[in-house]
């Protein structure tokens, strides 16, 4: 049953995405605000399909970030970008430049002025990151960045990249850490979409003005501690797998 439900979701998700992405293409010629609405609609539709077909719900904890703020989140799944697009107002996502080359997806990212960085050019990438970050903050948008730079499996921690510290120092805004347990239900490069409740928790904001070392230590401690707690609440990978079999 898990296989069938996962297959049904994946087919529905890709079919819906193709229809919406192509159908909303004329928005490229219209004001950017309409592109944001289309992206939010796609995200809500994805979450709805996930709930109805796969039995995967979600819960948001903590205060929802508003306005010009830096959101630094644990990244375990594609779900993370989907939900951030659904619940935040005009988020500016930090993403790798290669994603801009994907037809339609890259066009939407450029139209909505997402922050694309070239990870092969360290110094210039940081300068570009800061310049685009300042532009997003000036527009009153929240910036969403995944400090590890890529998705990590539940229970693992990757090195936090220097870009987050540079943004925090240069932008002069609060940083809201965030933790998830999404990888237990929608794993990176995984086919299965497991039933249960994904939790995204926004943690206590870190005020501007800390030195680099204090900021990074505070950020990593809060995010990793919360991520471990959320994984424990869900029972970890073995418990998720057992519940999936029981519901089959």
Segments from the language model and where they lie:
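Catalytic core of membrane glycerolipid acyltransferases/transacylases, capturing the structured
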Residues: 21-39, 51-53, 69-122
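A generic structural signal for well-ordered alpha-helical segments
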Residues: 50-51, 109, 136, 168
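Generic preference for hydrophobic
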Residues: 60, 71, 93-94, 200-202
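Glycine-rich helix-loop-beta junction characteristic of Rossmann-like nucleotide cofactor-binding loops
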Residues: 61-65
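Generic beta-sheet signal
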Residues: 68-73, 141-145
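Non-catalytic C-terminal accessory region of glycerolipid acyltransferases
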Residues: 126-248
């Amino acid at each position: 049953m898990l296989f069938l439900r996962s297959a049904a979701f994946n087919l529905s998700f890709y079919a819906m995405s193709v229809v919406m992405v192509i159908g909303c293409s004329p928005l490229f010629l219209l004001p950017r605000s309409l592109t944001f609405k289309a992206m939010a609609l796609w995200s809500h539709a994805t979450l709805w399909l996930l709930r109805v077909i796969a039995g995967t719900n979600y819960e948001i904890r903590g205060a929802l970030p508003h306005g010009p703020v830096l959101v630094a989140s644990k990244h375990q799944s594609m779900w993370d970008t989907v939900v951030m697009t659904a619940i935040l107002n005009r988020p500016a996502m930090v993403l790798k430049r290669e994603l801009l080359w994907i037809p339609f997806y890259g066009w939407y990212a450029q139209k909505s002025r997402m922050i694309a960085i070239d990870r092969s050019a360290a110094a210039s990438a940081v300068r570009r990151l800061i310049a685009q970050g300042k532009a997003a903050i000036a527009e009153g948008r929240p910036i969403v960045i995944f400090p590890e730079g890529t998705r990590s499996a539940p229970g693992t921690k990757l090195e936090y990249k220097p870009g987050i510290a540079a943004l925090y120092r240069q932008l002069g805004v609060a940083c809201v850490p965030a933790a998830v347990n999404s990888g237990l239900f929608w794993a990176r490069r995984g086919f299965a979409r497991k039933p249960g409740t994904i939790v995204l928790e926004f943690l206590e904001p870190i005020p501007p003005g800390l030195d680099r070392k204090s900021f990074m230590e505070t950020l990593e401690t809060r995010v990793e501690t919360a991520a471990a707690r959320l994984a424990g609440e869900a029972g970890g990978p073995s418990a998720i797998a057992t519940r999936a079999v029981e519901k089959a």
